[in-house]
Amino acid sequence: MMRNLAQQVGLFVCRISSGTSAWNSVISASYFSAGITRYSRSTVYRGYKAWQNLLDSEKRRWQRACAKYQGLVTSLEKRLCDMHQSYSTGDEKGMIIYEDYIYFQDNGCICRYKPNTGEDSLEVLLISEDLGLGDYEIQKIRVSPKQKFMAVTLKGYEREESTCVVVKLDNGPQVTHCIENVFSCEWATDRMLLHTSQVNVQCRQVFATDFSDANGAAQLVYTENDPRFFVDLYCTRDKRFITINSNSKSTSEVRLIDNRCPFEPPVLVQKRIAGVIYYIEHSNGCLYMLRRHGEAAEYKILKAAVSSGMKHWEPVYEVQERTKLVDMEMLKDHCLLFLKNHNQLSLEVIGLPSGAVLQSIKLPAWACALELDHQAEYGAGTVGFSLSSPVHPPVHFEYSLRKKQLSVDTNHSSDGIHQFHTLRLEAKSKDGTSVPLTLLYKDSEKQMRQRPLLIHVYGAYGMDLNMSFKVEKRMLVEEGWLLAYCHVRGGGELGCNWHSEGVLDKKLNGLEDLGSCISHLHGLGYSQPHYSAVEAASAGGVLAGALCNSAPRLFRAVVLEAPFLDVLNTMMNVSLPLTIEEQEEWGNPLSDEKYHRYIKSYCPYQNITPQNYPCVRITAYENDQRVPIQGLLGYITRLRKAARDYCHESGTSESRIPHIYLDVHPGGSHCDSLSWEESLRKVATQLAFLHMELKLDIPRRCKGSTQ
């Protein structure tokens, strides 16, 4: 099954990752290594001491500035905490059903029990605090076929790489091994674990550790030599094969390890062909390939016998043009496809091996995000999933293959579904392309033009905007805010071609789309520039930062999280571990003057100029390997100088100089270096900044605590 990908800004909630499809396993790896992976490099060349002094200066500046927000931050933080508790969905999403046991995570502990015997069978298998690893979150859990061993990956807030802890389960749980720098792992047999090695945010090697060997020594299984490729592992839904997936932005290659004979060398499915991306599943003796070939092509499902070349693959199903394949669940005799067309989610059930469409179901119009349940049984007759939106908490649904019926779980809250409006709009971009956008709001006595508007954008790597439920978004809409999600080119909301139209020398399409979406909303009477703000994270910072340069009067404030703001210098520095990999998204300015000129034309850092900028707040992480702090220090310094220069040149009062802040947190991960409590305060601070800079009234539920 696939997992939706983005936790870019909202509150962090730790959940176990229990199993993914080949489709999502590889997409997640690509996204992890590049989709939200951004490097920045300042052109302000300084020695270590100089930039450390600049960093210390920025920290002091922010400490002085944040004093004026403190009362509002405290009250917002309390309200967010209360709302989070009231909308908590419990631990059921972290549960893994494995034969007669249910595994679950609770406050850093992993436990299991037999549902038929109740609490008497409860076992505590692992307590993360007892490992002495510091503040770690549980990332993934993998149980061996006969439940002799359990592998758990844990990730600390201070580093990108995870630690894999192996627990022996029979005769009482016991930690036997810790394997450092692991990105993904899968059990081939009850005692053989395959795992990838992550070094400098790259995965290039696969190892196998045999725990029947007293030494538990790791043996090298596969090495990827092309720096454009990222390696990930996935176990097919029927547990027959482990796939070794090597993927660049545009090309794939998959090898199979047969779990019945795991010591045999991996078997190549199809040699890599430039422009061909594919993923592999297995069912009833057939391999199923999810494949796309070419920039404009959408995904197709094909089938063949094991070890057949590309010419022997037979078509089974094809995704329609301008349709996004959101998720996929492969079962024994069926495949469930979750699709998005015109921003509307739907479910299609196809029979295997024929590929005939057995049923098509439109999902509720309010739904913006989908998450499949963890690892349904391969031969199960039902598939569960949750639907949500930024303002609607998850609602659980089940599809019955036997009844051919979709049902909603009445035990899950549907609170607020009818309180809020979900409006699907389209804006005409500069070249006439229709760009979809989603507007969320609640009825209010206040006129639409006087209400604050928060605009969201990403527009890179073919990834959708994250539109899952977040309590801070719910709170804003309850207070009368409008939330706009601009599905610009470069993202994936309209399928693979939508990404192709916003990549390489078409990146400016995404910028034009964003400006057109905001202007369209204002033209329809939804808010106005004085009450509008933009929010973006990571690669979304490219478009948000570029729009600050090209159309700063469209909005009053911008909040950025670990943003990518210096595309040109990043892509010219091949010593950075991901620069070569990123060339398929941004181009190579070192070898092609065309790309050098083109990137320079939109790069946020390169195009800062004296003008009246919006207020800016950037959240950064001191040891972030993906967006090094030096680059953001250079950006902030140049932006602040440009704002001051404009003030002096235009004779504007210094009181009108926009507030430009860099809030630096300790930690070494990208966008998620904080504990839950720290994330709560970060979000509250971002909201307080927006309220103050847009000159809004204090939220009515916060007035008492700020006086």
UniProtKB/Swiss-Prot annotation:
The gene is prepl. GO terms for molecular function: serine-type endopeptidase activity. It comes from the Eukaryota. The active site is at 538 (charge relay system), 624 (charge relay system), 670 (charge relay system). GO terms for cellular component: cytoskeleton; cytosol; Golgi apparatus. GO terms for biological process: proteolysis. Homodimer. Serine peptidase whose precise substrate specificity remains unclear. Does not cleave peptides after a arginine or lysine residue. Regulates trans-Golgi network morphology and sorting by regulating the membrane binding of the AP-1 complex. May play a role in the regulation of synaptic vesicle exocytosis. Belongs to the peptidase S9A family. It is found in: Cytoplasm, Cytosol. Its main location: cytoplasm. Keywords: Cytoplasm, Hydrolase, Protease, Serine protease. Its EC number is 3.4.21.-. Signal peptide: none annotated. This is Prolyl endopeptidase-like.
